[in-house]
Amino acid sequence: MDDLLDLGEERRRSSATSGAKMGRRAHQESTQAENYLNSKNSSLTQTGEAPPPKPPRRQGGWADDSMKMAKLGKKVSEEMEDHRLRQQNLMGSDDDDIPVIPDLEDVQEEDFVLQVASPPSIQVNRVMTYRDLDNDLMKYSAFQTLDGEIDLKLLTKVLAPEHEVREDDVGWDWDHLYTEVSSELLTEWDLLRAEKEDPVGPSRYI
């Protein structure tokens, strides 16, 4: 029993001493490293050499993030397009659905410049003029009767010639037209007044 207690105390002592030794050694190593760095810096300052410059640190902002997101989105869209095209190729892999493109030798060259569309053919009845009607009335006696029963000779005798009926195309002027109409109305009113004032006929008693 005493032996066991002695062994436990020795273990405690050995562990305490070993922990202290390790702490001292570690402290010694750290002090040695600091001394080495201090001596190196002092030697550099004595010789006049500057320490090497630090490499530039790359800094990114929101633009880098947006470029990364754009590249990522483009990659995802390309993958989706490839997947869709693969599915279409698998679905349309039948030989019956493949269109046949004719060769250029089989296609006949046609000169479309020389091909002119034909004009439409429309039957238009020619309208007769007054002169044609007059000539027909004078030449052909058949036109002097309507439906073989009505005689049109009396009508053709009293028809006025064309030069009497035709009027010249004259532009209307408002002032000229107003004076002309007003003068005609005044003359008519004067005639009516004269008829009212004068007796209608010769007097019975003379």
From Swiss-Prot:
It is found in: Cytoplasm, Cytoskeleton; Cell projection, Cilium. Residues 29-48 have a biased composition (Polar residues). Keywords: Acetylation, Cell projection, Cilium biogenesis/degradation, Cytoplasm, Cytoskeleton, Phosphoprotein. Residues 1-71 are annotated as: Disordered. One of its GO terms (biological process) is cilium assembly. Expressed in the retina, iris-ciliary body, lens and cornea. Higher expression is observed in the retina, predominantly in the photoreceptor outer segment. The modification N-acetylmethionine is found at M1. The keyword Acetylation applies. The keyword Ubl conjugation does not apply. Pfam families: IFT43. It comes from the Eukaryota. The modification Phosphoserine is found at S77. GO terms for cellular component: centriolar satellite; centriole; ciliary basal body; cilium; cytoplasm; intercellular bridge; intraciliary transport particle A; mitotic spindle. As a component of IFT complex A (IFT-A), a complex required for retrograde ciliary transport and entry into cilia of G protein-coupled receptors (GPCRs), it is involved in ciliogenesis. Involved in retrograde ciliary transport along microtubules from the ciliary tip to the base. Component of the IFT complex A (IFT-A) complex. IFT-A complex is divided into a core subcomplex composed of IFT122:IFT140:WDR19 which is associated with TULP3 and a peripheral subcomplex composed of IFT43:WDR35:TTC21B. Interacts directy with IFT122, WDR35 and TTC21B. PANTHER family: INTRAFLAGELLAR TRANSPORT PROTEIN 43 HOMOLOG. Belongs to the IFT43 family. This is Intraflagellar transport protein 43 homolog. It comes from Mus musculus.
